[in-house]
A protein has these predicted regions:
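Conserved, well-structured core segments that form or line functional sites
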Residues: 2-170
Length: 170
């Protein structure tokens, strides 16, 4: 009985994986105002493969940064070596290190030459939860360690740590 159950579970996981990785967003999706992109990113799924394991989460929280006119944006003071990705083609990852501790994942928006981005603040874990928990030094077998799945990827630093996103992805 457990053998058939595990085969069924594996088939369901495989079907979900295929559905998750079925459609990539075109770069044109990001070639517009970050506020629009941010609203439409909610509910989309971010997929990453780490050591041949599929990791996926649904976008549940974002922040839009408008570039030169936005004092909180990294691009507010213009192009630098650090933020040059924001001024490039839309749809690229802009990853930065903050407080000497955390990485943050942004996606560039706006036409090339203009800066804007959407910060991915939180994801709802979908696939690869044990791997994501281990990447955050949590024990996936300990119910108290991953008691609330919403907290596993709740925050830009947590989701980057869980998905293995660093400046190497910038």
């Amino acid at each position: 009985m457990s053998g058939s159950l595990s085969r069924k579970t594996e088939r369901q996981r495989r079907a979900r994986t295929e559905a998750i990785s079925a459609r990539l967003l075109a770069r044109e999706f990001f070639n517009r105002d970050p506020r629009e992109v941010g609203r439409e990113l909610l509910g989309k799924i971010i997929v990453r493969t780490e050591r041949s394991k599929l990791l996926a989460g649904r976008v549940v929280e974002v922040e839009a940064y408008l570039g030169a006119g936005d004092a909180a944006a990294h691009a507010a003071a213009g192009r630098t070596q650090r933020n040059h990705v924001l001024f490039g083609p839309p749809g690229h990852a802009y990853v930065y290190f903050i407080y000497g501790v955390h990485y943050c994942l942004n996606i560039s928006c706006m036409p090339e030459g203009e800066a804007g981005c959407v910060l991915i603040r939180a994801l709802e874990p979908l696939t690869g939860v044990p791997e994501m928990a281990r990447a955050r030094d949590l024990n996936p077998l300990d119910p108290t360690s991953v008691r609330d799945l919403r907290k596993l990827l709740s925050g830009p630093g947590k989701l980057c740590e869980a998905l293995g996103i660093t400046r190497m992805r910038d």
